[in-house]
């Protein structure tokens, strides 16, 4: 009965476009365990939302999976410099192969007796297993939006590592801005926030279906949104100006333009930007950061462009991975230790983290 009431309340909030704005509740509800101390294996599934509708939405889902019978090979496939080469999608250096997953970012138990997240270490990750059984439990959900002429698979170096850290990552392929779109137009970005909300409403309905293989493992009261470039614009467009939102957090990578009216989020926001980005200048991201009404952080990568720091092994990747993961752990798992790690996640030369109104 409690679950039915929760879903009803969420659907009311989603249909209305706003709802309770409790960004970092504490303690975590019983349906969600504490932030994981060890990385999960990663599975992947795909489905299409509204396949016969006006705007069909193919969706890729990466999720925490049960361990494989034998340890998987640990490898990040070679980067294909020809993939995702459009100026607002992942550029050549950012076009990571489709299957890399998160490296081990958790240390052995420390002197305190608790395992704590460590620096990412080698930029390698476990192989993604399509159709693998879900790990037990319910997990917070991150909706990830790709950039222009891009695809979810080109962002898997980051999104699969988030899945290994205990998040269900759902990534729609937007109908008119993806790499394979027949009727491509960048102007369609303004319609993508509505597409993203349509997907979230669908996920909430799945969470209400008894025994649904996906819905049974999603904490549908714990959503965040993230995206790169035009996907970052889409993410920002999901936050109505100055209004509470069912989204508990947002991550805007190399983005910040307003595509759906003025956006001044109340929820915690993290911005990631290269200082030498010529496609979406850092000033665009900083202006969006300045408009935030709630807790916000800005990770700047000195001398970097539009997304090379999203490729494993490139300068800044380890810091971006650590910062984004801890930001999600704080906002979706109420992990206070992750909040307190944020100032030290990006202390390498060439990275600077600025924060405003973060809890202490």
Predicted regions and their residues:
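Alpha/beta-hydrolase-fold serine-hydrolase catalytic core, especially in secreted/extracellular enzymes
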Residues: 26-27, 303, 313-360
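Alpha/beta-hydrolase active-site loop
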Residues: 154, 186-220, 237
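Short glycine-enriched nucleophile-adjacent loop
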Residues: 204, 232-244
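A conserved short beta-strand
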Residues: 245-255
């Amino acid at each position: 009965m409690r679950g039915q009431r929760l879903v009803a309340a969420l659907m009311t909030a989603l249909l209305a476009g706003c709802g309770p704005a409790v960004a970092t509740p504490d303690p975590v509800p019983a349906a969600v365990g504490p932030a994981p101390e060890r990385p999960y294996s990663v599975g992947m599934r795909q489905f299409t939302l509204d396949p016969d509708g006006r705007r069909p939405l193919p969706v890729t889902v990466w999720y925490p999976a049960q361990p494989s019978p034998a340890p998987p090979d640990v490898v990040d496939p070679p980067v294909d410099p020809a993939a995702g080469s459009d100026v607002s999608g992942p550029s050549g250096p950012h076009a990571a192969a489709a299957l890399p997953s998160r490296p081990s970012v958790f240390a052995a138990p420390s002197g305190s007796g608790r395992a704590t997240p460590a620096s990412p270490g080698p930029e390698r990750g476990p192989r993604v297993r399509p159709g693998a059984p879900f790990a037990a439990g319910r997990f917070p959900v991150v909706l990830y939006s790709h950039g222009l002429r891009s695809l979810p698979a080109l962002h898997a170096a980051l999104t699969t590592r988030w899945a290994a850290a205990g998040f269900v990552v759902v990534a729609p392929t937007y109908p008119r801005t993806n790499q394979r779109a027949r009727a491509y137009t960048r102007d369609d970005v303004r319609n993508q926030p509505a597409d993203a909300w349509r997907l979230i409403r669908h996920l909430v309905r799945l969470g209400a279906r008894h025994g649904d293989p996906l819905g049974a493992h999603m904490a549908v009261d714990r959503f965040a949104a993230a995206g790169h470039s035009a996907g970052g614009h889409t993410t920002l467009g999901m936050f109505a100006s100055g209004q509470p939102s069912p989204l508990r957090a947002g991550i805007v990578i190399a983005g910040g333009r307003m595509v759906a009216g003025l956006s001044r989020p109340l929820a915690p926001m993290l911005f990631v930007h290269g200082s030498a980005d010529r496609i979406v200048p850092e000033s665009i991201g900083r202006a969006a950061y300045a408009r935030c009404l709630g807790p916000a952080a800005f990770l700047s990568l000195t001398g970097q462009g539009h997304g090379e720091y999203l490729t494993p092994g490139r300068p800044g990747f380890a810091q971006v991975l650590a910062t984004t993961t801890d930001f999600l752990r704080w906002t979706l798992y109420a992990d206070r230790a992750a909040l307190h790690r944020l100032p030290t996640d990006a202390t390498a030369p060439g990275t600077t983290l600025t924060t405003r109104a973060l809890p202490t």
